[in-house]
């Protein structure tokens, strides 16, 4: 019996699903519930212990126990298997993983390539990249912790492929992990050349892909491995292992790219980043698996600011009690590293201190709709606030936000003022993002 079947025989599907949602028994081995994957009022989510299968007749989601854990916890198959094996008390060697020789081979090959890149960085051919890292304030300890390497030139890549073949790996193996790509004429070229190489790890610390930064001129500046059985960009966060290592009650920073993560870590901040994609709902959930509070600090340029707003739109409906994502807008089009280098760590701390919670983000966005001496724009302001609050799925949070919004609105109406009037005992916060002032009435209630 392989490990997958052993797990299925050890844990009932309803036992796993019942930890997340309330199941209603239909008969001895079948259950029905409200679907955890979409909003519905009438239960259409069916669970069968006999078949080891779930199916929602509303949204079409279906699968087995591994599919469910992968979808609900935003993890890869390997991580789902490890979690369920631990839950079932089944011992197995993750490093050898003999039940799946192909997977074992891919993990071994990825580690082998990563080790080779590290050797390149420490060799004479890596001097330029080493100097680049040192100039950015990234020391040897950080380089080692992130396993940073160098892919080398065509000659060194040819030599790497030759050695890998001698060790029993095939070109097909190398194509599957994204080291080599094949064109229409069946010719093979190297995916990463003359790039600073950063291994992307899964939650168990295994290399599953790479990110490469070009040193010097050329495009694309950043390049990720193609998606594989092991690597899914929309579900993976970069830096999770080191973020957990450096957390120690410090603030977790969410930034745009892996160089931001490495730089922030070198300054003492645990950090994670998405991998060339807009931050997804899956990745937001993964962030909260690291810390109950995180600070989104994207670049201060227009692209970074717009990306921040898109993340907020995804985050707002999914607000949870005791899970907070706060938003920071850096001034002067700076990225986090540039801001720290220019202003120092104390100023960066102040920026984090002034981070906005969800309610204040709604408020700030609403203020953009107000025009002085235009009552209709005030009505648009109120409607905007209420419509955004109505998107929140958690009933308790929604009601708390409604109460706070109503108190702020009543203060405005009572004083017969508009939010731009500085004489009405309002706290004024200056944000560079929209060149507007965010005015928060003093209600005595704080909702972050």
Model-based region annotation:
Residues 7-10, 28, 99-107, 123-126, ...:
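Conserved phosphate/pyrophosphate-binding and hydrolysis machinery centered on Walker-type P-loop NTPases
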Residues 73-80, 84-85, 194-212, 337-342, ...:
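Structured, non-catalytic alpha/beta "coupling" segments that mediate domain-domain communication
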Residues 69, 274-277, 298-300:
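Short beta->alpha connector loops at strand-helix junctions that form conserved
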Residues 11-13, 17, 103, 111, ...:
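Phosphate-handling DNA/RNA-contact segment within nucleic-acid enzymes
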Residues 79-131:
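Conserved active-site segments centered on acidic
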Residues 1-97, 155:
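N-terminal structured subdomain of primase-like DNA metabolism proteins
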Residues 202-203, 244-251, 281-294, 300-448:
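A charged alpha-helical hairpin associated with nucleic-acid processing machineries
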Residues 35, 56, 69, 133, ...:
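Terminal peptide-recognition signature
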């Amino acid at each position: 019996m392989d490990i997958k079947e052993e797990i299925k025989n050890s844990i009932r599907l309803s036992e796993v699903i019942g930890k997340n949602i309330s199941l209603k028994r239909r008969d001895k081995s079948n259950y029905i519930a409200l679907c955890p994957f979409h909003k519905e009022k009438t239960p259409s989510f069916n669970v069968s212990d006999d078949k080891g299968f779930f199916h929602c007749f509303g949204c079409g989601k279906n699968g087995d126990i591994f599919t469910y854990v992968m979808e609900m916890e935003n993890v890869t198959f390997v991580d789902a298997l490890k979690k369920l094996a631990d839950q079932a008390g089944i011992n197995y060697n993750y490093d050898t993983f003999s039940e799946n020789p192909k997977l074992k081979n891919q993990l071994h090959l990825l580690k082998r390539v990563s080790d080779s890149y590290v050797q390149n960085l420490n060799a004479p051919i890596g001097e330029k990249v080493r100097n680049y890292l040192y100039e950015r304030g990234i020391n040897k300890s950080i380089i080692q912790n992130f396993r940073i390497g160098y892919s080398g030139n065509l000659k060194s890549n040819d030599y790497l492929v030759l050695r890998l073949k001698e060790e029993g790996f095939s070109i097909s193996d190398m194509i599957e992990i994204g080291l080599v790509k094949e064109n229409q004429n069946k010719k093979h070229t190297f995916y990463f050349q003359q790039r600073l190489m950063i291994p992307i790890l899964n939650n168990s610390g295994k290399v599953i892909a790479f990110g490469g930064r070009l040193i010097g001129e050329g495009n694309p500046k950043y390049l990720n491995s193609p998606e594989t059985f092991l690597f899914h960009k929309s579900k993976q966060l970069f830096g999770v292992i080191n973020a957990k290592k450096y957390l120690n009650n410090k603030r977790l920073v969410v930034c745009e790219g892996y160089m931001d993560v490495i730089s922030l870590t070198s300054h003492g901040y645990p950090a994670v980043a998405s991998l060339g994609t807009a931050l997804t709902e899956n990745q937001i959930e993964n962030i909260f698996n690291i810390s109950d509070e995180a600070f989104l600090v994207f670049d201060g340029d227009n692209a970074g600011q717009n990306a921040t707003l898109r993340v907020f739109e995804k985050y707002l409906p999914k607000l949870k009690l005791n899970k907070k994502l706060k938003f920071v807008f850096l001034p002067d089009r700076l990225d986090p590293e540039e801001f720290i280098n220019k202003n120092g760590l104390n100023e960066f701390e102040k920026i984090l201190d002034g981070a906005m919670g969800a309610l204040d983000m709604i408020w700030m966005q609403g203020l953009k709709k107000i025009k002085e001496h235009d009552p209709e724009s005030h009505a648009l302001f109120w409607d905007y606030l209420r419509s955004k609050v109505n998107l929140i799925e958690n009933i308790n949070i929604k009601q708390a936000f409604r109460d706070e919004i109503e108190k702020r609105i009543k203060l405005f109406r009572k004083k017969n003022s508009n939010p731009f009037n500085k004489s009405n005992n309002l706290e004024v916060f200056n944000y560079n993002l929209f060149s507007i002032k965010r005015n928060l009435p003093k209600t005595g209630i704080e909702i972050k």
